[in-house]
Amino acid sequence: MATNFTPISSSLYVGDLLPEVSEQHLFEIFNQVGLVSNIRVCRDTNTRRSLSYAYVNYYNGADAERALDTLNNTPIRGKACRIMWSQRDPSLRKSGVGNVFIKNLDKGIDHKALYDTFSAFGNILSCKVVTDDGNSSKGFGFVHYETQESADKAIAKVNGMMINGQKVFVGPFKSSKERGQPTEVKFTNVFFKNLSEDVGPDQLKELLQQYGEITNITIMADDKGKSKGFGFANFESAEAAKNVVENENGKIFHGKPIYAGRAQKKIEREAELKHTFETKYQGVNLYIKNIDDSIDNDKLREVFSQFGTITSAIVMKDDKATTSKGFGFVCYTAPDEATRAVTEMNGRMIGTKPLYVALAQRKDIRRAQLEMQHQQKFKTGIRQQMPPTYGSGPVFFTPAPVNPQVVYQQMMPRPRNWNGQPVGVPQGQYANMNYARGQPRQNGPRQNGGQPRQNGPRPDVSGAQPIPVQQQTTLDVAQTQQAASSAESALNLQSIINLPSRDQQNVALGEHLYPLIHNSQPDLAGKITGMLLDSLPVEELFTLTQRQDLLADKIREALEVLGSN
């Protein structure tokens, strides 16, 4: 299996990976061959799930070549991987030069056996046997040679040869465009609807028998034998069924225009209807939340009608259809109207609340976007501006520093070995705060101006008597509760908007959101608070401090994202 050419790079493509294979798994395997520079598992941009292939880069090209020789087809977590040289030029990959197609392969032929058979004719860049979801061979595969000469030699020698008792076909690879467009779907069963009540099997057969042999006709009826207005006709040939659909669909039959089309399974119909619906309303349907309780359907339509023609406007209500849920939808006839409405209305005060207006999205898309944001932060290490208590350890909520110029400490997404205590807490201010279960925090020696600091009473700077640890803790807690109470009474939307930066707005909102989230999710309050502060506008964050029901929904969404990771 050795390759005899010098690689042009030290980058390898590793394919056919299971979704759960991570960079760490690959590093443990490939670093045994030589020093690995970096590894990247390619992931979906929305869901961040693995696309089942990766790139492994070595510092040394010889190490990469050795890894290709020794690790190709090695099982990784139970499934054989496929390794080839990384080819960054897409024109070379898609040109078809040197690419060979093999079919009628025995089910026992895998990547390695195919490689061993065809490597005699030249240097192979990639080799693959196509498999199904159960990892069973589909009976065909591809071999990509370095040169077209090697490919021609393989075709001449192996085409028609018996391999494992089966005569294989070997020929030049052709793209789907070269092979021609896929043939249209053939069918023999035709679905009819909008039939008159007096139309029975005999009348329908009389209409359709001119097109060809009919094997079966059924008109659906209720318990009393009354026609439901639809039925099926099954033909002997697909050509006859096709002619019926082309000629009879929309024609008047017994006083009504009938529908004739290919009979579909329920799952096909639902997928088609869903696609039609999503295409029709894409870019024109708006999602509005934080709606004042006094706003009804008519008022919502009136407010948004200035931007274009509205086809529907609805405020969602509870099961009793009496109380507004605080959100709704407005649908326009054109995307530019919807875009203008989003630009003008998002954040505008209607009634007593600022509206949140955005293009409507499916729940799975919203969740994927939130998950992507969270994953990107975890991966790149972007820090969030958050109060120092956004961890899961402290029982008490820490007040803001006395000096208004002091910036709140930043915090990374929680790593595996994180112990749940505040990150970067200024020394001398919260050093003696009690933590969960009433246990005092144990401080080891820390460097402060080059001097180690021991746990104990604070130094007497002002000439006053040192305050014992226990007494100082009590004072800190009392100050915490007093500060939180004062901040809560002073919180209003305008004061937050007037703050000079988004970081300061996040701090003000975070001080109120954190204890509310901590009530239901004490272990994850820090993470969830950070996710909300980063992904939501100020107006909506303020609303969450006032509406427990909306906050509970957001907490639930965040838990779903965290749970999937």
Swiss-Prot record:
Gene3D superfamilies: 3.30.70.330, c-terminal domain of poly(a) binding protein
The keyword Nucleotidyltransferase belongs to this UniProt entry's keyword annotation: no
Renumbered residue ranges of the record's region Disordered: 435-466
Biased composition (Polar residues): 440-454
CDD domains: RRM1_I_PABPs, RRM2_I_PABPs, RRM3_I_PABPs, RRM4_I_PABPs
Subcellular location: Cytoplasm; Nucleus
Name this polypeptide is given: Polyadenylate-binding protein 1-A
Organism, scientific name: Dictyostelium discoideum
